[in-house]
Amino acid sequence: MSFSESRHNENCLIQEGALLFCEQAVVAPVSGDLVFRPLKIEVLSKLLAFIDGAGLVDTTYAESDKWVLLSPEFRAIWQDRKRCEYWFLQQIITPSPAFNKVLALLRKSESYWLVGYLLAQSTSGNTMRMLGEDYGVSYTHFRRLCSRALGGKAKSELRNWRMAQSLLNSVEGHENITQLAVNHGYSSPSHFSSEIKELIGVSPRKLSNIIQLADK
C-alpha cells in the first residue's frame, strides 16, 4: 500500500487486516486489491476527551504522523462499539509507541476539542445558541458539529453530564441544594431537584439520604 502527502511518499506491506488512522493523505494499493471499511473515530475522540479532561493520562504534546497503521489481534472488536471502547481503554493503560501516535492524531481532531469545550461548559447553564456563538459558528452548524462529535443530541448529552457532576457533588455532601443549583447552572433549587427526579426517578436529597444510610 502506498501513502502520499504533499511531496512525501511511503510504502507499507499489509498481509492481513489492519487499522489505518490517517490525516489528509492519499492512500492507494500498489498491488493487489484494497478492501476497506470506513470507521467513525468520533467515538474514540469523545472517549479520549473525557479521559484527558479527568487528567488520567499524560497529554504532553507530541507531533503526530500523517498516518498510523495498527494491527489489532482481534478484528472482531471493530464490529461492536463496546468492544472497540474496551480495546481503546486497554491500549491507553499501556500504550505502545504506535498507539501514542494514534492518540496524537485524535487530539488534533475537531471532535476531540469540541467535546472538551462542551465538558468545560456543561455546568455553565448557557444555551446551545450561546455556546455556538462563543464557539464562533452559526447555531445550525454548531448543532451539526455537536451531533457528529457526541453521537446524539447535544442538549440531552449536556443535560446528563450536568446531572452526573451535580449528583457526585451532592453525594459527597460538600454543598447544599442551593449551592449545587447555582454552581451547576440550574435556574433554582426547585429546577435542580425536579430535573434530577425526572432523569433518575428520585430527588437529589432522597438519593443522598439513601447513600448515607447505606454507608452506616
From Swiss-Prot:
Keywords: Activator, DNA-binding, Transcription, Transcription regulation, Virulence. One of its GO terms (molecular function) is DNA-binding transcription factor activity. Induction: Transcriptionally activated by HilA. Repressed following invasion of host macrophages. Residues 129-150, 177-200 bind DNA. InterPro entries: Homeodomain-like_sf, HTH_AraC, HTH_AraC-typ_CS. Residues 112-210 form the HTH araC/xylS-type domain. It comes from the Bacteria. Transcriptional regulator required for the expression of several genes encoding type III secretion system SPI1 effector proteins. The interaction with SicA is necessary for the activation of sigDE (sopB pipC), sicAsipBCDA, and sopE. This is Invasion protein InvF.
